[in-house]
């Protein structure tokens, strides 16, 4: 495929995912509201800026939103119907979300803990979920250990955390650090050694910065 055709293909896939996300949102709503309210809520969801502008740019936001909604939809489905197929699909989507957004691992742990204490799913099926999730993420974890001698899932956890926890962050986050307000941070990033640990050290700078922001102003950032 030529570059332009490839871009159009990516845009088309993002549009499809964004459109299907609205339908997933509608299905999730039906667990709590009437059909009428579910349709109204889904329409409002369909016109929020995130669903519109991410389709016109090369971004992982569309697939992350799609997987997040699919995760919730499959969670409700699994609680109601504990079939092997639902267990496998839920586990695979959970693993993919952890690979897309490392911080989702925290959400997964809390979800897993809630399911465990509420006894929504028996222990055997919970163990199956953990095994499948581990199998999904293990190739990338092993790859990172071979290259960096560290057991890490993704190399952008710190940056993603900082995007949502800096003084310019809004609801959708703020990720531009090449500005005057973040001069010290920018200088630290520029001085990172370009060795095989570059990506890890680069991300750790943002992780430490985000952690400092949260510790100094926990009410604002936490």
Task: State the predicted function of each range.
Residues 12-32, 70, 74:
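Transmembrane-helix motifs of polytopic, lipid-linked glycan transferases
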Residues 42-46, 86-101, 111-113, 132-136, ...:
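Membrane-interface alpha helices of multi-pass inner-membrane proteins
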């Amino acid at each position: 495929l030529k570059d332009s055709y490839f871009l159009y293909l990516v845009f088309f896939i993002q549009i499809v995912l964004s459109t299907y996300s609205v339908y997933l949102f509608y299905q999730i709503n039906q667990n709590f509201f009437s059909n009428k309210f579910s349709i109204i809520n889904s329409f409002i969801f369909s016109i929020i800026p995130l669903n519109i502008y991410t389709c016109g740019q090369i971004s992982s936001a569309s697939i992350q939103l799609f997987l997040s909604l699919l995760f919730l939809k499959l969670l409700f489905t699994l609680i109601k119907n504990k079939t092997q197929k639902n267990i496998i699909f839920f586990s695979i989507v959970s693993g993919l979300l952890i690979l897309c957004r490392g911080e989702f691992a925290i959400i997964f742990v809390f979800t897993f803990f809630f399911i465990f204490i509420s006894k929504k799913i028996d222990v055997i099926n919970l163990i199956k979920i953990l095994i499948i999730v581990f199998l999904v993420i293990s190739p990338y974890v092993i790859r990172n250990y071979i290259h960096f001698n560290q057991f890490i899932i993704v190399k952008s956890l710190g940056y993603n955390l900082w995007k949502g926890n800096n003084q310019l962050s809004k609801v959708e986050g703020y990720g531009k650090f090449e500005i005057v307000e973040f001069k010290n941070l920018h200088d630290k990033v520029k001085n990172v050694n370009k060795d095989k640990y570059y990506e890890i050290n680069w991300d750790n700078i943002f992780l430490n910065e985000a952690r400092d922001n949260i510790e100094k102003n926990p009410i604002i950032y936490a």
